[in-house]
Amino acid sequence: MSDDTVTPMMAQYLEIKAQHPGAILFYRMGDFYEMFFEDAALAAEALDIALTKRGKHKGEDIAMCGVPIHAAEGYLLTLIRKGFRVAIAEQMEDPAEAKKRGSKSVVRREVVRLVTPGTLTEDSLLEARRHNFLCAFAEIRDEAALAWADISTGEFSVTPCPLPRLLPELARLAPRELLVADERPLDWIEEVGCALTPLARASFDSASAEKRLCTLFGVGTLDSFGNFTRPELSAMGALVDYLDLTQRGKLPLLRPPVREVAGGTVQIDAATRRNLEITQALTGGREGSLLSAVDRTVTAPGARLLERRLSSPSRDLGLIHDRLAAVSWLTDEPRLREDLRASLRRVPDMDRALSRLALDRAGPRDMAAIRAGLTQAEAIAGRMPADAPSLLAETLEALRGHENLVDLLDQALVAEPPLLVRDGGFIAPGFDDDLDETRRLRDEGRGVIASMQAGFIETTGIQSLKIKHNNVLGYFIEVTSTHAEKMLSPPLSESFIHRQTTAGQVRFTTVALSELETRILNAGNRALELEKMHFAALRTAILDQAGAIGRAARALAEVDLIAAFADLAVAEDWTEPQVDDSRAFAIEAGRHPVVERALRRTGTPFVANDCDLSKAETPAVWLITGPNMAGKSTFLRQNALIALLAQAGSFVPARRAHIGLVSQIFSRVGASDDLARGRSTFMVEMVETAAILNQADDRALVILDEIGRGTATWDGLSIAWATLEHLHDTNRCRALFATHYHEMTALAGKLTGVENATVSVKEWQGEVIFLHEVRRGAADRSYGVQVARLAGLPASVIERARTVLDALESGERESGPRRQALIDDLPLFRAAPPPPAPAAPPKASQVEERLRAIQPDDLSPREALKLLYDLRALLP
């Protein structure tokens, strides 16, 4: 065969690959998925597996690599996480069937699934405690919408979304994949933060989208689901079209779409989410985030619901009150709370099991998960008293009424079923008499094998003779090579038929063994076919009740979250916040939940602080001054997080909290260069500040830290001053504004809504002690040089800094020509003095001398008390 001749198998591969140019093709060949050409080179590098070759094409070697079927999911996960899409081409017939069409016929193969980041369903490919959203963005003239779905759970929603709101919405949902029309300019692609998939404009056609959705949900009109705009229909239709493409016609079990109205949740932009570390720490992981600090859920659906609540705090007062009332009730019911959590720990992920059943990717364990979840649902409903708050009482209907399905699954399934249908053995004995009889025949045949082996040993006199089985030879008789000559010679050779010789072993069969093997295989195959038939029937029975099962799963997640919030409140001594439609913001003894948790590990107590921005009908701004390291940023963040937690339906880390409904949370705390877009730290800071000033309404909560620090002093002061005035006069919102520009404290006397606050420090023998206490008033200095010394700057640098600082401060105290002369005579351009000699240790104070002379074990209680008074008298 010449190099240019394409084999039938390779011709089939190239044809399938041409239909999926943007994906790596997993091409099934027996027990392996093989990859060829460029796919092989890409996959071998990404998966760190060997790259080989197989034949030639157009004179060039064909690159090849492969992964075993049994380990394919792990390799798939690696490829998906590295940004690849994978098309899976399976063998659609047995090789024996292909040979009936001719000796050169190729096994028929088809792509059964296109695996992408937003279309995962297998547990091994998903994060159990996080959603896996697929989003679609559609624009029609001046309107736009965003639809999203998690096909692993069935959640399906849509919301109006003008382009300026797209990035904040994507930050809220954190999708794995975004679908856009292929003609859409992608100038914002680097900000999306997920895989971006362009689709043909036809996928976004709103007219065909409506028909597509009606077909999916089996309805004649979508009116019962909501009054959707054309962009909303377009976005939902594109999403469903993409699912049809990737799942090859096996659409997931999506719930009817929920239309989220604009303004239903607190608006939080991407920068604020990042700064507040709501679901992800600045280091990139979950640890160190608010989510990590407050997560006490015991089920995967409960954990996913918690993430959604923290990402989307509610603005619905009635809903907030219902959630808080349920949490409050469970804090007062410790025994019930622990019983509920004990039952919830036994609840599997029913949502994802149900989704796999709908997509025909499930195994017996998914059915067992449905059985276990519904069993616990009944148990939890039975524990819930009649006087439970409305939110918990509403779950009872969803948790009850599953007895018939649970009984069916109990009768049909063994207690611990295998993972895969092909493994068999998952249908319980006694469920089907025919299956039981077939299994008996199969198992008796295996018993006969043992008897036959004993007979062969007696006949041959070879004690090491064994009857074994593999997938190639079936059942065979094996002896070591030392006995080969005996077995191959008369009279044994007349009944023992030689099959195979390997290194060290020789294998034989007999007519009787072959006949027995046929009977065993027939019984085994029939038993497996009967089990597959029952699996299909059970799958249908489960999917017939998919709606009720989904409602039970969501009810269990709600109970889990309420119980988790209650457990958190009791364990951490959190308080129920008062949330109303006032403009109040009064926090007494508030704490930062993440920082407090971190300090507890070191045995360090957290210093709680008050915050009051409760000026009625007027803006309320605290202008906070104080040194670095004193805790200003922590104070700012903790108050934003307290507001967020309250509107998410949680108790809060404070002694008391009264929060008037917050519509938006904005945070400009910390900054870094955006090198990819050529933006400096100062530019990033200004862009984020501009977004706040342009968008914050009078119910927003804004926290700003060190505005203007990235430029020249007077420029920075001017920008910070004007920003604070704009917040006060135009936005008229509640705000915490931290600054090092002490000149700004004068605004407290000029703007009625501005008050000064400072973080206290104490100086002791030249040392700075940070008290982390916020009090009314202004700081008198910044202590920057002292902080630099604590950071470990060389003593010569610290001394030089003090010299410059003294000159600058004396210049500020002068005026007119004298001040200018001092500025001109600054020591900035003089030669620096030589490094000072190491300072002698300071002379011990009288208190220290007395303490060193004490032998505590020799003191009586009376002497110790007297000594304490003496030491107090020695203090200056």
From Swiss-Prot:
The keyword Magnesium does not apply. SUPFAM superfamilies: DNA repair protein MutS, domain I, DNA repair protein MutS, domain II, DNA repair protein MutS, domain III, P-loop containing nucleoside triphosphate hydrolases. InterPro entries: DNA_mismatch_repair_MutS, DNA_mismatch_repair_MutS-lik_N, DNA_mismatch_repair_MutS/MSH, DNA_mismatch_repair_MutS_C, DNA_mismatch_repair_MutS_clamp, DNA_mismatch_repair_MutS_core, DNA_mismatch_repair_MutS_N, DNA_mismatch_repair_MutS_sf. Keywords: ATP-binding, DNA damage, DNA repair, DNA-binding, Nucleotide-binding. Residues 829-856 are annotated as: Disordered. Transmembrane segments: none annotated. Residues 832-841 have a biased composition (Pro residues). GO terms for biological process: mismatch repair. One of its GO terms (cellular component) is cytosol. ATP binds at residues 626-633. This protein is involved in the repair of mismatches in DNA. It is possible that it carries out the mismatch recognition step. This protein has a weak ATPase activity. Belongs to the DNA mismatch repair MutS family. This is DNA mismatch repair protein MutS. The lineage of its organism: Bacteria, Pseudomonadati, Pseudomonadota, Alphaproteobacteria, Rhodobacterales.
